[in-house]
């Protein structure tokens, strides 16, 4: 989220530095990630990018920065790249494929994020493991393939059971984190 941390992570040899919307909870003191804005994210991406890391800087697109229109999605993704991100990450499954494609159309690489998606914390019933029940596990697996097929170069699997993560990893051609 900041230059000192970025220097440490880069020196440790990390392949990427995710400047996450979790900055809302970790640094800014909010109870969830819904309060962080695109302006906040630009600020933190720029702080990390100014260290000129060899690690890929991933700018997390906050809630409502890619939910309203294609134009907003493109403008917000481009603003994170202008701040120094090499790519962007956005949450959600099949219903976010259009947003992924809009960003890829302007040649910005996209990382996906499924499972526990903190921007949907209220819809998911809180911060808890997703996919423990069979139907929920199927939904997560079904969300992974369209994201990979849409062009995401990697997909974050957050708070899903090991078996579900294995199924997803085995069913798509892109790396899972």
Language-model-derived ranges and their functions:
Residues 1-177:
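Alpha/beta enzyme core
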């Amino acid at each position: 989220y900041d230059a000192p941390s970025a220097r440490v992570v880069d020196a440790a040899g990390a392949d990427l530095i995710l400047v996450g919307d979790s900055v809302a909870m970790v640094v800014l003191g909010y109870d969830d990630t819904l309060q962080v804005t695109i302006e906040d994210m630009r600020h933190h991406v720029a702080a990390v990018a100014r260290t000129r890391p060899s690690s890929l800087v991933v700018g997390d697109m906050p809630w409502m920065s890619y939910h309203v229109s294609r134009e907003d999605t493109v403008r917000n993704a481009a603003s994170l790249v202008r701040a120094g991100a090499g790519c962007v990450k956005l949450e959600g499954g099949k219903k976010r494929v259009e947003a992924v494609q809009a960003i890829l159309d302007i040649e910005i690489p996209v990382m996906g994020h499924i499972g526990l998606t903190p921007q949907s914390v209220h819809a998911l019933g809180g911060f808890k493991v997703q996919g423990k029940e069979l139907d929920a596990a199927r939904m997560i697996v079904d969300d992974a393939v369209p994201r990979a097929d849409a062009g995401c170069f990697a997909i974050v699997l957050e708070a899903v059971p090991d078996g579900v993560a294995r199924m997803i990893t085995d069913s798509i051609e892109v790396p899972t984190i």
